Amino acid sequence: MQLPDTFTQRMQRLLGSGYESFLEALQQTPPTSVRLNPGKTAAKPGLPKVPWAEQGYYLRERPSFTLDPLLHAGTYYVQEASSMFIEQALKQVIDLEKPLHVLDLCGAPGGKSTHLASLISPDSLQVSNEVIKSRAYVLAENVAKWGSGNVLVTNNDPRDFGRLKSFFDVMVVDAPCSGEGMFRKDLQAIGEWSEENVNLCAQRQQRILTDVWEALKPGGVLIYSTCTWNEQENEENIAWLSEQEQAETLKLILRPEWGITPTHLNGVEGYRFYPHLTQGEGFFMAVVRKGGIPEEEAIGKKKKYKLTLAGKKEQALVENWLQNPEQFVWLQHGEVISALPAPLFDAADKVFQNLYVLFAGAEIAEVNGKKLKPLQGLALSQHLNKAAFETADLNLEQALRYLRKEDISLGTNGSNWLLLQYKNIPLGWAKQVGNRMNNYYPKEWRIRMELPQELPSFTLLTA
């Protein structure tokens, strides 16, 4: 691994006597870690824990995750362990029992968004944003698979959030960066690194922070992170923000065995993850509280709603498909009926009024007259009422062929919608037509790789 000279000199200055151990760690295989979805499984795998994340686990080796149906079912997410430290920021600084408005600004592919969704209360509204459209669709897919039902996925530039003044209690900005912390995982990142790129990244990060700052409530919390080590993109940017705005960094409690390195530069409290000290990739995080006192939201004359409620007839057709249907508001856009926790309606409508929303809540059904088609979002929802449907459990080969959108046969006969499951966790829908079965797995989500002749024995959860 040939590292750039200026990068090497800076890391020697930052790490001192620890530099040789750092270099050695860069030659080692990165650890593989996953985070379970507590809304879908209560399993506790017999695996080493990620100590700062309740649902985080290290795997002994990296399997072919594509060949585990439970990944596609949203039962867990493959996430780098260092970035799970966001959990400590939320738990130590924020009252997670309260209803909150939370923004994940740079959300794709969905690691932090799905993590946030597991930590906040069900009556909190989360907005997960991605500026690049193709990546925003990937984010929406992963949010749908997670199935929490209280997330809106948007496709906006950070400056657009200025329209939502003092709207968010919590903002997560995992800023685009020079990627120094990914060097051992992605050798291409080394080739793309330069001092000029570091400068450009730092300037872009400042623009992003400036663009979204007005949308954070006074007293609200910003969690800022990068996967890089230089001070310019990290502590110096937060010091710059503190000078520009009324803001202070917050100190978190660390356990020595975690191996996380606290930093104190220009009055900024930061947290660094180095691979020779912490079991994870390179990462930086700082937690910032915005100055001022939260204002009571003014109650003015309500503008016309942008969201459209489903009619009573349409609602009656689908409401028993969710557990506790009275807790939801039922929305209709064209032929699609969606569900959103009822307390979130006004806040969600405000987001719809001001941003470009790709995905909201849980998509339940497509209605055409009296014909109903259950949608993939319902199958993967944590609020699905499985008792409303006929279910069929698939073995590993059947599940993977279903996820490849191949025809499968279960030897059944009828004309019902079937909820297909693997290890009792829903994967999606099929429609029986006599002794034939139509596969309704979304084409754009299908597994594209060819299945090996011998399927792997790996599965993260045994039951």
Where are the regions a protein language model picked out?
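Conserved AdoMet
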Residues: 30-85
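Conserved class I S-adenosyl-L-methionine
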Residues: 97-108
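Mobile active-site "lid"/loop adjacent to the S-adenosyl-L-methionine
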Residues: 134, 169-211, 227-234, 256-258
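S-adenosyl-L-methionine
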Residues: 129-166, 173
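Helix-to-beta-strand junctions that scaffold the AdoMet/dcAdoMet cofactor pocket
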Residues: 121, 216-218
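Class I S-adenosyl-L-methionine
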Residues: 168, 221-224, 228-339, 343
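Conserved SAM-binding loop of SAM-dependent methyltransferases across substrates and taxa
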Residues: 109-122
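Polybasic, low-complexity RNA-engagement segments
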Residues: 1-14, 18-41, 291-463
